[in-house]
Structures are given as structure tokens and as C-alpha cells.
């Protein structure tokens, strides 16, 4: 992300992400913000995978909504940069792994939407915002149930205890994505794109658990393994065109809502404004 420090504009990255990837043989490259689309594309074409870390809230205009009073800080340039990288990666079938904000970015890039503040929009949900410094980043907060036929289950099994540091969540699920894990209150905790070699996002922070939790390490390993593999040959024929049409349809017409119990679980709902990147 970008940040001001003693009058300087800095790009910063949590070292835990870098160490988690480097330990498994990856060569992490931090992509600068504020770049032209052409320059950003030049960097993208040299990558083998895209990792999307946690961070600020995503500007709701990207999924056709007004700002909620409890929306947190946003970063316009980071939103723009990550949306471009994510959409390009999904179009190409390049492996993608998203953490916390990262899974939300994957969803928005595919035409989905977010709850801008979980507890004000649904008071019946459990607490998910165990933020530091009040809580340790590695604090186990709840369990997730993982779909047994998912890529995530291959890494983490069918049930897993996770940390939780978010006040937003997945609402309308984007095109080509499937909810593959839920918290005990029904809130989506992970998404993946079954048609692609590896496109997975989780709402928790596995990098904070990886030192003592082999299953969290497995998730990073599977991403690195996919990035080093022959993913360029695995994307389905016609996927780019299919994705563009599907993403546009979802963002215009609504789609399956993700949660159980408190919200609709199926059907076309509303007509949110078109996401700018779905074109």
C-alpha cells in the first residue's frame, strides 16, 4: 500500500507475506502503485502468479454502491492497480491467491459485491473484527467449514480454525467463483474459481499462522506450485470472452447472494450499477 512518512510517499508491504512465499521458493516482486496501465501491464507479463494481501477497504463504487457511513479508509491507486492485476490474471488463467482484502478484491474484480460493514448491516453475525493491537494477529477466532471437493480442502482439510481481522465480507458472489468455506454464522470465508488452474481467496490471514500450522503453509505451497507450473496451457478455451460476458452480467443484474439464513441464498437480486472493470 502507499503511505506518507516524514513527508515522503512510501510503498510498504507486510514482511510476513514475503517470507511466507520466499520460504517456499517464490521470488516475490512488490508492484508499485501510481503506474500507467501500460507500465503495469509490462510488469504483469513477467509474472507467474499474483498474490493479493490484506489492507484497506475497497471503494464501493467499484461494485456500484454508495459509501456506507462505517466504511474504513480506502486507497484509490491501490484499488485501481489490484483490480487491473486481478482481472488480467483471471482472464489469462494465471494463479491468484488472495488474503483478507485479497479475497474481496477477487470477488469485486469478477463483478461481485461486499458488505461494507458486517455488523451494522447484519447484527446477527458473529464478531469477525479482531483487530490488533487489541488482539494478536495470530489469535484463533473461529472455525471454518471447507467444501470437501475444493482446492482449499486439498491444502487445509474439511475444517480449520482461523484468525479473523475484517469488518467487511463477501455479499454477491462474482462470476465464475464458488464459495468453498464458511464461518459458523454462514458468512463466506473463501472463494475459488473452479474453471481455472488456481484462483483462491481466503478471508483470514494464513501468513500469521504458517509458522505453527502446516495447513496454512500448504495453501501458500499450492499457490507457488501452481505459479511454477504449466498454467498457461490449462485455462479453458474461450475463457477470456466467457469471463468478460459473465462478469458484466453479474455486476449489472445481481447474482447468487452468498450467506445463509440472514440473506437470500439464490436468485437475481436488484440491479447494481456496472462495475467499471467488467468490460
Where are these regions (language model features)?
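Active-site-proximal beta-strand elements of phosphoester/diester hydrolases
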Residues: 200-203
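Glycine-rich beta-to-alpha active-site loop
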Residues: 98, 103
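N-terminal beta1-alpha1 cap of cysteine-dependent amidohydrolase-like domains
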Residues: 1-97, 108-115, 119-156, 161, ...
Amino acid at each position: 500500500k502507499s503511505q506518507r512518512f516524514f513527508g515522503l510517499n512510501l510503498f510498504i508491504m507486510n514482511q510476513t507475506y514475503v517470507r511466507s512465499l520466499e520460504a517456499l521458493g517464490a521470488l516475490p516482486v512488490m508492484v508499485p502503485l501510481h503506474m500507467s496501465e501500460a507500465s503495469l501491464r509490462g510488469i504483469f507479463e513477467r509474472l507467474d502468479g499474483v498474490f493479493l494481501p490484506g489492507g484497506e477497504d475497497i471503494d464501493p463504487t467499484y461494485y456500484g454502491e454508495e459509501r456506507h457511513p462505517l466504511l474504513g479508509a480506502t486507497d484509490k491507486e491501490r484499488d485501481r492497480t489490484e483490480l487491473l492485476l486481478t482481472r488480467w490474471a483471471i482472464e489469462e488463467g494465471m494463479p491468484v491467491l488472495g488474503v483478507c482484502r485479497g479475497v474481496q478484491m477477487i470477488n469485486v474484480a469478477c463483478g461481485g459485491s461486499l458488505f461494507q460493514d458486517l455488523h451494522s448491516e447484519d447484527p446477527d453475525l458473529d464478531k469477525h473484527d479482531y483487530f490488533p493491537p487489541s488482539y494478536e494477529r495470530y489469535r484463533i477466532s473461529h472455525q471454518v467449514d471447507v467444501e470437501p471437493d475444493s482446492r482449499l480442502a486439498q491444502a487445509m482439510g474439511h475444517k480449520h480454525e482461523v484468525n479473523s481481522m475484517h469488518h467487511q465480507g463477501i455479499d454477491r458472489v462474482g462470476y465464475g467463483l464458488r464459495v468453498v468455506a464458511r464461518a459458523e454464522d454462514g458468512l463466506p470465508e473463501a472463494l475459488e474459481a473452479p474453471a481455472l488452474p488456481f484462483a483462491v481467496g481466503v478471508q483470514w490471514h494464513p501468513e500469521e499462522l504458517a509458522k505453527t500450522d502446516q495447513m496454512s503453509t500448504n495453501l501458500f505451497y499450492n499457490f507457488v506450485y501452481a505459479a511454477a507450473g504449466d498454467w498457461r496451457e490449462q485455462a479453458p478455451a474461450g475463457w477470456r470472452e466467457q469471463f468478460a460476458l459473465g462478469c458484466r452480467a453479474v455486476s449489472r443484474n445481481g447474482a447468487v447472494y452468498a450467506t445463509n439464513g440472514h440473506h437470500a441464498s439464490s436468485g437475481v437480486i436488484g440491479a447494481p450499477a456496472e462495475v467499471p472493470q467488467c468490460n
